Curated annotation (Swiss-Prot):
GO terms for cellular component: chloroplast; chloroplast stroma; chloroplast thylakoid membrane; cytosolic ribosome; extracellular region; nucleus; plastid large ribosomal subunit; plastid ribosome. Its main location: plastid. The keyword Signal does not apply. It comes from Arabidopsis thaliana (Mouse-ear cress). Residues 106-138 are annotated as: Disordered. Keywords: Chloroplast, Plastid, Ribonucleoprotein, Ribosomal protein, RNA-binding, rRNA-binding, Transit peptide. It is found in: Plastid, Chloroplast. One of its GO terms (molecular function) is rRNA binding. Transmembrane segments: none annotated. One of its GO terms (biological process) is translation. This is Large ribosomal subunit protein uL4c. This protein binds directly and specifically to 23S rRNA. May play a role in plastid transcriptional regulation. Belongs to the universal ribosomal protein uL4 family. Residues 1-49 form a transit peptide.
Amino acid sequence: MASSATAPNSLSFFSSSLFLSSSHQIPKTYISVSKLGSGRVSKPLSVSSQLATLPILSFEGEKVGETYLDLKAAPEDTARAVVHRAIVTDLNNKRRGTASTLTRGEVRGGGIKPYSQKKTGHARRGSQRTPLRPGGGVVFGPRPKDWSIKINRKEKKLAISTALSSAASAEGGAIVVEEFGEKFEKPKTKDFLAAMQRWGLDPKEKAMFLMIDVDENVAKSSRNIGTLRMLTPRTLNLFDILNADKLVLTPAAVEFLNARYGVDAVEEEDDDEDETEGSEEA
């Protein structure tokens, strides 16, 4: 008997479950369909994060305006896994994997029998290279190994944008400061610490600055502060984002983040290629 039920108008996703709904109930979400005609729809790869409004401070520490960050973020049920995989990949790819030890067959010398087999009162011994003797070989010691892990560029970008979105959405997690490169006529750490205090930053807390171009005097004034990281889009990485207590951005850096990691960002053609280098530009 043929069913009289009509086809649903649309599909929507709620709490990782598939429900039928009308066209006016479709939430704004970004989904990826693996194969057309396969009848299977994959889970959302990324969704728009909550719009984060950030205050803009002048060099003197006064609020002069507001700006926003609207970045892609992984769904709540997969965000932790996406960020964890990306940070493990970065840390593993930084390992040299050159640790090496010598086995008893590689240790130099010790070919002669140390003493007679009998009449010494000692245990019989055939070589000085045995792992039981000082200077002998090592049993199951470390050997050179490639620790690198591959990760898709889209996945790495999603992890970075998720971390940035989380930091920006947290109360007091991020601020925007007007360009201050010309304010430092000469390198002086004392002046930079005073500026940080005007911006509400504690020098004892970890802070990450993201600037498009770092002035030479700014770089020299801040390099003696152990809790501070001064980054550019070329050196932006997930570890420093997660390790920082507060993010400090410039207006140009905000525009860069919205353009590269925002909801309307255009994906690159080679985003599906794998990455193994942890120091590549994110």
